[in-house]
């Protein structure tokens, strides 16, 4: 067997092992009528990354807040709730990255309504990705009147990041905007605007009972303060003159 053949066999096995080593989709009850779904993906430079989203139940209907990373896990998530008697009424994506939108194409193929802001759809189109079938504009949007509110605090992690507020439960899904322990991937971030956006979010939802970030543990409203501090720190660091290379 040639060295090249051995290399490709090793590469294939490594990829297969990495895929098999990803944890299974997790679905956990957070509050009455609110579930956290957690999917996992191998991300270059970051290793295996967990991503949280929500499923909100309104009577016999279920709404997805962000899809899992993949179509496969999105199908698993939908099936889990359908088997328990719920109709999947729609999905909303909090920004254009794949950890929020990876299941849109599968949902569209099943005629399940998908929602995103006009800006998110524009960014998806720019990237050659499948767009949500429904879009909205403005700072506020009610996915379900008095039950599921979407709010745009301004640019931060991405230009289009929105959060989702559940007023009856006082639960805020902050998604990838909430970064209490470090700003993470800054590839599409607006460092200059993030502190102002974070301050607005803190003032609006400072009495939230629970705050759900995308990539760290669920916490209380203190995560809003920590995110603001990280955003300010990131802005200050961006203003420091770079050290000359030797």
Swiss-Prot record:
Localization: Periplasm
Tell me which residues bind a beta-lactam: 179, 185
Q: TM spans, by residue?
A: none
Instruction: Tell me, in one coarse class, where this protein mainly resides.
Output: periplasm
The protein's required cofactors? Zn(2+)
Activity regulation remarks: Inhibited by captopril stereoisomers, Hg(2+), Fe(2+), Cu(2+), chelating agents such as EDTA, dansyl derivatives, including dansyl-C4SH, bisthiazolidines, mercaptoacetic acid and by PMPC phosphonates. Inhibited by 3-(3-mercaptopropionylsulfanyl)-propionic acid pentafluorophenyl ester, via a covalent binding to Lys-179. Not susceptible to inactivation by the beta-lactamase-blocking agents clavulanic acid or cloxacillin.
Upon changing residue 99 to A, the result is: Almost abolishes catalytic activity against cephaloridine and imipenem; drastically reduces catalytic activity against nitrocefin and benzylpenicillin. Only one Zn(II) ion is retained in the active site, in vitro
Q: Which GO terms describe its biological process?
A: antibiotic catabolic process; response to antibiotic
Tell me its EC number(s), please.
Answer: 3.1.26.-, 3.5.2.6
The record describes how the cofactor is bound as:
Binds 2 Zn(2+) ions per subunit.
Superkingdom to which the source organism belongs: Bacteria
Q: InterPro entries, from UniProt? A: Beta-lactamase_class-B_CS (IPR001018), Metallo-B-lactamas (IPR001279), NDM-1-like (IPR050855), RibonucZ/Hydroxyglut_hydro (IPR036866)
What's a Gene Ontology MF term here? zinc ion binding
Tell me what effect the entry lists for residue 99 to E.
Drastically reduces catalytic activity against cephaloridine, imipenem, nitrocefin and benzylpenicillin. Despite mutation, two Zn(II) ions are retained in the active site, in vitro
One Pfam family cited in the UniProt record for this chain: Lactamase_B
* The keyword Protease belongs to this UniProt entry's keyword annotation: no
The record's keywords, sorted A to Z, are: Antibiotic resistance, Hydrolase, Metal-binding, Periplasm, Signal, Zinc
CDD domains, per this entry?
IMP_DIM-like_MBL-B1
Spell out the note in the miscellaneous section. The class B beta-lactamase family has a specific amino-acid numbering system known as BBL, for standard numbering of class B beta-lactamases. A multiple sequence alignment was used to derive a consensus sequence and then the consensus was numbered taking into account insertions and deletions. This allows use of identical numbers, e.g. for active site residues, despite differences in protein length. UniProt always uses natural numbering of residues, hence there appear to be differences in numbering between this entry and some papers.
Function per UniProt = Class B beta-lactamase which confers resistance to the beta-lactam antibiotics, including penicillins, cephalosporins and carbapenems. Acts via hydrolysis of the beta-lactam ring. Has penicillin-, cephalosporin- and carbapenem-hydrolyzing activities. Has endoribonuclease activity, cleaving substrate RNAs preferentially between U/C and A, in vitro.
User: Belongs to which family?
Assistant: Belongs to the metallo-beta-lactamase superfamily. Class-B beta-lactamase family.
UniProt protein name: Metallo-beta-lactamase IMP-1
């Amino acid at each position: 067997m040639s060295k090249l053949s051995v290399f490709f066999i090793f590469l294939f096995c490594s990829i297969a092992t990495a895929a098999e080593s990803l944890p299974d989709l997790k679905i956990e009850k957070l509050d009455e009528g609110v579930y956290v779904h957690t999917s996992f993906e191998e991300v270059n430079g970051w290793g295996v990354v967990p991503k949280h989203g929500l499923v909100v139940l309104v009577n016999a209907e279920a709404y997805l807040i962000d899809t899992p990373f993949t179509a496969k896990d999105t199908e698993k998530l939908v099936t889990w709730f359908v088997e328990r008697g719920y109709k999947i009424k729609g999905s909303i994506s909090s920004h254009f990255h794949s950890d929020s939108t990876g299941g849109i194409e599968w949902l569209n193929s099943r005629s399940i309504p998908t929602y995103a802001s006009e800006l998110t759809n524009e960014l998806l189109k720019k990237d050659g990705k499948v767009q949500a079938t429904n879009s909205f504009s403005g700072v506020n949007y009610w996915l379900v009147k008095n039950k599921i509110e979407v709010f745009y605090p301004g640019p931060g992690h991405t230009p289009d990041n929105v959060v989702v507020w559940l007023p009856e439960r006082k639960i805020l899904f902050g998604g990838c905007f909430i970064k209490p322990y470090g700003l993470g991937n800054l590839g599409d971030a607006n460092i200059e605007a993030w502190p102002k956006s974070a301050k607005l979010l803190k003032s609006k939802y400072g009495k939230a009972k629970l705050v759900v970030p995308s990539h760290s543990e669920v916490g209380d409203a203190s995560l809003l303060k920590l995110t603001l501090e990280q955003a300010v720190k990131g802005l200050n660091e961006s203003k420091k003159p770079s050290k000359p290379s030797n």
